[in-house]
Amino acid sequence: MSRRYLFSSESVTEGHPDKICDQISDTILDALLYHDDHSRVAAEVVVNTGLVLITGEITSKAHVNFVELARKKIAEIGYTDADNGFSANSCAVLVAIDEQSPDISQGVSAAHEQRESLSNDELDQIGAGDQGIMFGYACNETPEFMPLPISLAHRISRRLAAVRKMGELPYLRPDGKTQVSIVYEDGKPVGIDTILISTQHTETIDSLTENSAVQAKIKSDLWEAVVQPVFGDIEIKPNQDTRFLVNPTGKFVIGGPQGDAGLTGRKIIVDTYGGYSRHGGGAFSGKDPTKVDRSAAYACRYVAKNIVAAGLADKCEVQVSYAIGVARPVSILVETFGTGKVDEDKLLKVVQELFELRPAGILQTLNLRELPSQRGGRFYQDVAAYGHFGRTDLDLPWEYTDKANLLKEAFAIPLSEVRVGV
């Protein structure tokens, strides 16, 4: 019997209060790793009306100006006008940073396997920075191997920010959210049920002063300048039955940190798969790659994406877990939700042979420590908004499908059937 249902995912723009915090945290991380790629960083940020608080634990040989980094990032996002209730030049920036706990540091610098003389392997030298579970996911719903709802929500958010920054819709302000509800039949996306955009805006637009007229213009402009371009190259498009909601409260003038306080790490579902896959609970931004909340989640995505790209499954979720101070994962699980084309027990063994999931191995494979210096001091801050996965606008090592051929060879599948990822 055919099953029809809706699945929804949301995204937020770079001007959302929580995303401001994520981007400042990762800007600090980039600066520290650029000057000292062995920096240990856990940078947390809070924003409110006229206030930025930078806190956390940092151990590094690098010396950077946290206040200057925060102001520069806030201005880049678009908060340069005090009328927004939050401005790069006028906000207060407070800094309260401690060093990483030596109790944690000793377990990362010398893993349990090394301290107990259980291994001389170089990749057993670094222990996990914390216990925890991490997930990675991929599916064949989009060319970038992401679920369609989150892919579209991010596209709309990025386009919304772009038309603001280009001056195409000059009345837009930095804060905004999007949400897309997809119609599924038997597990396959077949239609667009609802598109929702909430975007901060000026009180009046041109000569329009009545709020109803303002909202009508915003809705018309967003359909033409944002929604239609996003769906230009997508097979599934909105139709006459698709609901298009814009600022459903009726008004969105007060926004950004003036409207809501923001905090690093509070948009973890937006950062990953839009709720389509499970999440271990750990946030990414502000954390150096010895912290497996971040690095192992990237590695799990890398594994899952290569499995789907190799045609071994239509959907794949990878779970890995760690104990603090221990190099080797406590557990690894590969789940294909009944879409696997090969024996799953063998698939797990092949994954363990082809992919390195110890922290030092992840750092080495994905080059996570060196990327900020290799990219001119800017890397992690660019993934801090619009999702860490499925990015077609950034060159991200965990999005490579360079292991797909090896996976196929392990199961004697013709290499001509490998799908190349975006």
Curated annotation (Swiss-Prot):
Keyword tags: ATP-binding, Cytoplasm, Magnesium, Metal-binding, Nucleotide-binding, One-carbon metabolism, Potassium, Transferase
GO cellular component, one term: cytoplasm
An individual GO BP term: S-adenosylmethionine biosynthetic process
Ligand binding (ATP): H16, D175, G176, K177, K251, F252, D260, R266, K267, A283, K287
Residues holding K(+): E44
Catalytic reaction list: L-methionine + ATP + H2O = S-adenosyl-L-methionine + phosphate + diphosphate
InterPro entries according to UniProt: ADOMET_SYNTHASE_CS, S-AdoMet_synt_C, S-AdoMet_synt_central, S-AdoMet_synt_N, S-AdoMet_synthetase, S-AdoMet_synthetase_sfam
Residues that, per the record, bind L-methionine: E57, Q100, D260, K291
Chief place where the protein resides: cytoplasm
Single Gene Ontology MF annotation: ATP binding
Pfam families, per the entry: S-AdoMet_synt_C, S-AdoMet_synt_M, S-AdoMet_synt_N
Coiled-coil regions, chain positions: none
The organism's place on the tree of life at top rank: Bacteria
Keyword Endoplasmic reticulum: no
Named cofactor requirement(s): Mg(2+); K(+)
HAMAP family linked: S_AdoMet_synth1
Family assignment from sequence similarity: Belongs to the AdoMet synthase family.
Self-association and partners: Homotetramer; dimer of dimers.
NCBIfam families xref list: metK (TIGR01034)
Protein name: S-adenosylmethionine synthase
